[in-house]
Amino acid sequence: MLKFTLHKKDGYARRGTLELNHGKIETPVFMPVGTYGSVKAMNPQNLHDIKAQIILGNTYHLWLRPGLEVIGQFGGLHGFIGWDKPILTDSGGFQVFSLSDMRKLTEEGCTFKSPINGDKLFLSPEISMKIQTVLNSDIAMQLDECTPGEATREQARKSLQMSLRWAERSKKAFEDLKNPNALFGIVQGAMYEDLREESLRGLEQFDFPGLAVGGLSVGEPKPEMYRMLRAVGPILPEHKPHYLMGVGTPEDLVYGVAHGIDMFDCVMPTRNARNGWLFTRFGDLKIKNAKHKLDKRPIDESCTCYACQNFSRAYLHHLHRAGEILGAQLNTIHNLHFYQVIMAEMRDAIEQGKFADWQAQFHENRARGTD
């Protein structure tokens, strides 16, 4: 089940509601990444506290470990991980294609060696749909070939055509399995605007209830990614949700929303938190730096997260230097809370028709820097 309601537009920025089998999502939305069925350093209560509406799970990793037999015993991923809100799963394609020296790609699918035990495994559109049906994610993704950013035009065209054929197979398998959730198609085409349009036109025939933009933030320069967003975001179908996969920084989220994107996921806020890199309204802060050793202030005095309301930079500096798990948890709570606040503020600004003003103030604040 998927129902998308577009409430308001302000330029290309969109304010909507996405209804799924496990609840409603207000968009634009950021989805914390729970690769192995957990968002690193967070428990489900932490996620509820920061007002996360939906999380992402990784099909490839969950298939390898703990496996479908285990997760199937719990009726899917929600029951297994104790999360009652929506979940999106990727198709597993990105991880398989990352194993460039351990995999073989054909029209049928991809053969690869398990990085866990060396077993020979095979992933196809049909198998990806079967895995995601067992996971019972609210949003599943088609299996696509992940085109590298540096692909030549001919490589990108061949790749997107393969992805279109796999989109058709994914949709058929999804329907044959009587999966009650939603399946998204993925727009590919590397850094070529005309190929992105060709991919989008090709996907129209399958009438997916939502569309994702894939193949960005894969090593290309930031101006190139933004050029593709300017080209693709505004031409995505208005009545469907738009998902930008694997992106990104706070500035990337704002740029994406400004060009018609509704949904985002990225490991950056969680990974950076574990490395002591904290996002704030006034720029980024590296908590490991010695200047924080005696600092009694919170990370961000305007922030209402648990970490900022209860702990000093000095304590967080100590925890990080000591390698304490609590440090990673508090840093992660802060970064994910900050991302959720950005999204909530953008939703409000779009509703009020003041997105451009909000965007200008956001960039001014971020450029100011922390002291």
UniProtKB/Swiss-Prot annotation:
Residues binding Zn(2+), per UniProt: C303, C305, C308, H334
Record's GO cellular component terms: cytosol
| Annotated residues for binding of substrate | D90, S91, G92, G93, F94, D144, Q188, G215
Obligatory cofactor(s): Zn(2+)
Give the start-end ranges of region RNA binding. 246-252, 270-274
Report the active site residues. D90 (proton acceptor), D265 (nucleophile)
Q: SUPFAM superfamilies, alphabetically?
A: tRNA-guanine transglycosylase (SSF51713)
The record's keywords, sorted A to Z, are: Glycosyltransferase, Metal-binding, Queuosine biosynthesis, Transferase, tRNA processing, Zinc
One of this protein's GO BP terms? tRNA-guanine transglycosylation
Reactions listed under catalytic activity: 7-aminomethyl-7-carbaguanine + guanosine(34) in tRNA = 7-aminomethyl-7-carbaguanosine(34) in tRNA + guanine
What Enzyme Commission number(s) appear in the record?
2.4.2.29
Q: How is the cofactor bound?
A: Binds 1 zinc ion per subunit.
Which InterPro entries has this protein been placed in? ArchSynthase1/Queuine_TRR, TGT, TGT-like_sf, tRNA_ribo_trans-like
- For the protein in the UniProt heading, the enzyme class is transferase
Record's subunit section: Homodimer. Within each dimer, one monomer is responsible for RNA recognition and catalysis, while the other monomer binds to the replacement base PreQ1.
Q: Belongs to which family? A: Belongs to the queuine tRNA-ribosyltransferase family.
The job of this chain, per UniProt, is described as: Catalyzes the base-exchange of a guanine (G) residue with the queuine precursor 7-aminomethyl-7-deazaguanine (PreQ1) at position 34 (anticodon wobble position) in tRNAs with GU(N) anticodons (tRNA-Asp, -Asn, -His and -Tyr). Catalysis occurs through a double-displacement mechanism. The nucleophile active site attacks the C1' of nucleotide 34 to detach the guanine base from the RNA, forming a covalent enzyme-RNA intermediate. The proton acceptor active site deprotonates the incoming PreQ1, allowing a nucleophilic attack on the C1' of the ribose to form the product.
The identity of this protein, by name, is Queuine tRNA-ribosyltransferase
Biological classification of the source: Bacteria, Pseudomonadati, Pseudomonadota, Betaproteobacteria, Neisseriales
